[in-house]
Amino acid sequence: MHIEVANNNGTKYLRLAHCRRGTNRKGVRTIVKQIVLNIGPLSRFDDGKPDYLGRLRASFRDGRPLIDALKPYVGDAPKAKTTVTFVEGDATCIGSPRRLADVILDPVFEALGLDELFASVKHDSKIRYDLTGIVRLLTYGRLLDPASKSATMAQNGKYLRPLVGSANDDSVYDALDVIDRSAAKIFRRMNTKIAQGIGRSPKVVFYDVTNFFFEIPRPDEDVADESGDVVERGLRKMGVSKENRRQPIVQLGLFLDDNGIPISFGTFPGNTLDHHTLRPAMKATVDTLALARFLLVADRGMYSGTNMCHVLDAGNGYIVSKSLRKSSRAEVAWALEADGYDKPGADFRCKSRIVTRKVRDEGGRERTIREKVVVYWSRAFYERERRENESFLSFVERLRANPAGFRITAAQSKSLRRFVKGDVLDKKTGKILDGTKLVAMIDDEKLKAFNDLFGYYQIVTSELEMPDREVIDKYHGLTRIEDQFREMKSTLETRPVYVRTREHVNAHLMICFIALTMMRLIQRKTRQALGPDFGKGLDWTYGIPGARIAETLREWQANELPGGHYQMLNASDGDIATLFRAFGVDVRARLYTKGDIRDLKSSVSPF
């Protein structure tokens, strides 16, 4: 027996039903459903807490139903017996398991409004191929088994019910063009559905930039008009790779809400500086989504007067780190001064002040803004910086002790240039002269200033009244977006290996964005199912790691048996049991039909 929801004139009713194999009026063997008990309207019993229906089903399954009227039926369901006959030569004699991941993924995809969106795009564009099916297949494939677009299309037959109805696999490349053109619609639809389903949490919006490298022989060329003026910059350009690769890259800027759910992203040529991505990304996405006022939290690479003016002019605020090593001497001196710190001598101490800065906005006009500057010193941060620079500082001391005994490598030469008093380079070769001449040129004041800033960090904010520790805590939430990038580069294997054109690169990244958002929504449900003690003591947690969710959904399969029966595989315990509990899916130890599996999908509570 199972609990189901029936809709009667707009009112949802709970009822207890029992399904069994039987014979209908025409004498055909089929599934017969019997309504055992009409429980009553859902609104009468719903306690207002998250996922009431899932908890009710779980309580009935565990023998402790939340509704007293169900107690007489606990454990009374008759045990169905099914006879399966294998006939030699029947294909079902040899197992051929198919994926069931779409039982959970389809409701999440639909909850984001993407099925309706792509159906509308298909209708308006008079597309003949299965656009929605292709987007689903590409997205689910990116979650479960990342591969090229062609290889992902070949995965269609791995699902119990194929996701794509059209047979022409080449349509996937046409679909990529459509996805690229629909980017703004996708962002708006997903944001609207998330806001309606779980409530978008835009009080804090995180932003950061990563990049992806391409193994191609040369960067993309710019497109110029007849006058030689650049009308479109090439996308795959040489830049500073996050993975230290000397190959063309594409920049990606990602926005994230305070729940850890992605909001939108923007792509930029690889030679675009990080702080030049913020304003275009905001204008193209978050500025158009009608979000309530939020605090933009970003790393020091995003800080510039022009960027901060744009954030303020849009009615928002900001919390952004600012490099102390690139600050003025007066700012550094104030940070190092012991006066003003809340806990002098402690392993973590901070202080703040309000300053007035003159900056220029996007139009070049001079503006005056007031900011709160928060500086803190952390012993943990100090130890980390000291370890990171230990090898170089040790080299400098050994160089002092024995200058004639060193040959300076190219890497050491680059590091040393920051700490020399004058020009000690060979103008013809560009190399540093021998160690005996170099050691006398080391600027001890610069070296001391470098060491003095170990452990210090500076944050600026528009929120003049916000307590210092709250500013620091909100800034530290930026680690969530770093986890998004790790998930994209590992579990989702986002690096665009098999796409070439700008449109297809953008579409590929959009598929990865949708997959990442779905992953976070699934993890959010698992975190709720794991209870309040899960992750206790951590600053934050997404629940079950993304790689484990992908593996669990990939391995949840069904094997076809004679007579239209299906045996579920890898569906009993561990992470899959947590997923079932999280989404209110009641999977029992029995054989299933395709109708039963459809019922499981309809019972999923995506938000």
Task: State where each predicted segment sits.
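Conserved glycine(s) in the ABC-transporter nucleotide-binding domain "signature"
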Residues: 1-132
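Anion-binding and metal-coordination hotspots
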Residues: 3-5, 11-14, 105, 112-607
